[in-house]
Amino acid sequence: MGHCRINGKTQVCGLFGFPVEHSFSPAMHNAAFQQLDLNWTYVPFRVHPDNLKQAVTGIFSLNMAGVNVTVPHKQRVMPFLDELEPAARIIGAVNTIVNNNGKLVGYNTDGKGFVRALTEEARFNPLGKSAILIGAGGAARAVAVQLALSGLRTIYITNRNQEKAEELARDILESTDTSASMIPWGNNLLGKRMVEVDLVVQATPLGMSPEVDQVPEFPFQMLTPQHLVCDLIYNPEQTCFLRRAKSRGSKTMNGLAMLLYQGVLAFELWTGFTAPVDVMRNVLHKQVAKG
């Protein structure tokens, strides 16, 4: 049918955020619905924080299939849901809501999207591996928790705000079987840990457009071809951090893959169908190129 033929049987899902005008999700999901000939549509909703509770009630009242949730609602939405999956509870944020026969269930597909990107795009299995995480904000939390739930052996977290890094390490220790510890920002210990880690994840905004020359303090000289280096930034697609890692021979992955697979997972939670990943990837690349 395609998403343009709206009728009485059309299933509606969408995005709750404030703002939402910048989102790539509508183009990505609607292209996927068209590809699979599903009578579904994805609509962005600009939801003021004061109206969030009413908007969530609207998912049930309007019989929507579900929504994505973006800033500033990812934490605030949690009390209004009937159920949370374990990862969302540990991360402390929800980015996908599924209307399961009137029960609103909160998921976090950000971290799962990153891990699926690792396995699908970089052929990297976190089971039994070790990682360094730079940053301790929302995206960093999602990635760290999901890596731990996926069997990561050890994670070292460094962040300018030391307390946030310590809190994240503590949450991982309490909720998973992964060993987690904080390393002070810019500390020499980071270089020493490089010999034992397999994965480096840059999860700060440093290097994001337009400040493309910014880069976190990091012992690049310790990188080798054995390391996989990821930057969660996708604009620009090749950050200064990734370019410096490539110059050391390390394998690299940018943030587009995580953005793609968090959407893929949300699509599959709502529809029950296997997402057309290539179609979604192509649309996403075009959207990012357009800015």
Swiss-Prot record:
GO molecular function: NADP binding; shikimate 3-dehydrogenase (NADP+) activity
Binding site for shikimate: 23-25, 70, 95, 110, 234
Binding site for NADP(+): 135-139, 232, 255
Highest taxon, organism lineage: Bacteria
Keywords assigned by UniProt, alphabetized: Amino-acid biosynthesis, Aromatic amino acid biosynthesis, NADP, Oxidoreductase
Any matching Pfam family: Shikimate_dh_N
Annotated EC: 1.1.1.25
Active site: 74
HAMAP family given in the database record: Shikimate_DH_AroE
Sequence similarity: Belongs to the shikimate dehydrogenase family.
Description of how the protein assembles with itself and partners: Homodimer.
Known role: Involved in the biosynthesis of the chorismate, which leads to the biosynthesis of aromatic amino acids. Catalyzes the reversible NADPH linked reduction of 3-dehydroshikimate (DHSA) to yield shikimate (SA).
Protein name: Shikimate dehydrogenase (NADP(+))
Protein's organism: Desulforamulus reducens (strain ATCC BAA-1160 / DSM 100696 / MI-1) (Desulfotomaculum reducens)
